[in-house]
């Protein structure tokens, strides 16, 4: 029996576990590794009975190249809650993809914003992009994935997990306000995952609901759930933890949400979370 038996710690990946923001300052767009301190502390946590899972906004296509550098002993929740992947088989254990009418909804959005950049992440772990911009190229280079450029969303010939809108923050705020006025929005979720990233998923496909599904799959109790994240899309997850944590680099809305603030992501935020749990379960 380990001191962390029955404890589930879930964490966002980008700018919570790793300093993703730094790759946009690197000419070669290299993502730094998970800090050694975090790796050491997570291994200690798991060696003593704890379960650690990623709950990321990334699709599996974008998470897969980096998963070997993340100490984990559970499934990986992807695409802001649209799915849970068995890391060993790369198969979905749970799916909540966009509804069939999402392509028609996207066409309506594009009619209103004809130059909008969007990435359609597919259930077959591929991506289609409409109107790629420089940020799209940098995003793909940093995340080590390729995409197909299309002109019309109807060219996408697979189920769509999520749609990622890209652009300047002021423009995305205007887009967000427009989508919120649509009568069909009741069937969808919309959340910022970064300053230049706005994500559309199916209703119920959010980090809070997918964390509940992880607890169900792993047989863990809400009384021993701990969460870490830095962005607006992490808030549904952070709200359900017994105690939730945010790195010092988190956005103000997260820092002011009642979380426990730890060191920045690049300094080993999640490692410090384990240290705090070590004291709680002493």
Regions found by a protein language model. Name each.
Residues 6-28, 238:
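Asp-based phosphoryl-transfer active-site loop
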Residues 28-50, 95-103, 143-147, 202-216, ...:
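Short, acidic loop-to-helix structural element flanking the phosphoryl-transfer center
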Residues 47-53, 73-74, 162, 223-224, ...:
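Short active-site oxyanion
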Residues 70-72, 80, 88, 186, ...:
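Short, structured coil segments at secondary-structure junctions
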Residues 115-228, 232-240, 249:
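Conserved acidic, metal-coordinating active-site core of Asp-based
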